[in-house]
Amino acid sequence: MRRRLLLLAALLLANLAIAAVGMLRADDVGTGKAFTAKVGLVFDLGGRGDKSFNDSAYRGLERALRELPIHGEYLEPGDGADRESAIRLLAARGFDLVIGVGIMFTDDVLLVARDYPDVLFACVDMIVLPDQKLPPNVIALKFREEEGSYLVGAAAGLATQSKTVGFIGGMDMPLIRKFEAGYRAGVKAVCPECKILSAYAGVTPEAFKDPVKGKELALAQFGRGADVLYHASGSTGLGAFEAARLAPPGTRRLVIGVDSDQTHEAPGHVLSSMVKRVDVAVFDTLKAVSEQPHRRDIAGVRVFGLAQDGVDYVADARNANLIDAKMRERIEALRRDIVAGRIQVPSQVAPAEVAP
């Protein structure tokens, strides 16, 4: 009885917390078919409109709403403390699948999944320890970010004229170090003599939503001679694009976007973007659940790399003047080698590689 009262109290708090910031949204599907599943998406810091990670997840939900017979809703918690409340709210309302978008949902998903064994939960970028056994109703959606970062690193190494490139991370944590590790390896694969600068915006989740800090770090690296920067920092990276747009006439400043195609952020200054296909992972998971809401065979760890179309880089007509046919041919050869297993991309940065 006491446990039920505690869960009821938590649910009431969830309603109050989310209603207080007015962040509840719902989208019904106009497929003409009866709903086969109810699915919910809970965003992390930055929410919709971050032009990066969360927006990519939302594109996956949007596609599912267009193509699948599902009912879908999304929530934008007011702050990090509301993560558990938000996923608990959807679970208590009888949703078949609840997805937490971001690594910070790891503990919350594991906690709530125990209380709702009949609900499937998924977590994007979930932390899974080597010997950890996940609950049978939990899906960990993980990516080989280092593989996509390797390709944009190669693009940076081929495009740089100063032989100095930079990396800007959001929160200094193992996940973002994967981006840096792949980027460094890609740069060095095509430009062994290149110097790589590195900086992080902070050590807390707020480091992913500080464009002012991002601009400051970008200007510092441009000032030290870098002419190409890669950011893996959420909306903090918007400051890097601003720094590139402020380039004096005749000065070369290029930025590589992350998670989503960010070409539009600074046309003419965006070399490419490392596209982390959170939308693919979300859509594939929603599709599986729509076909059989109570299935459990999709639980466990699901990994998306180059071979699974989980990561990629942008190369099209908009940046053809920056990534020409010869450069693209070299990058595509590297892609084939990674998919075939001939190149093993590192996921950790060696201490000796870290530039001051």
Question: Which residue ranges define each predicted feature?
Answer:
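Short, Lys/Arg-rich N-terminal segment immediately upstream of the first membrane anchor
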Residues: M1-R2
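A residue-level marker of the well-folded mature domains of exported/periplasmic proteins
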Residues: L5-L8, A20-P356
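Core hydrophobic alpha-helical transmembrane segments of single-pass membrane proteins
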Residues: A10-I18
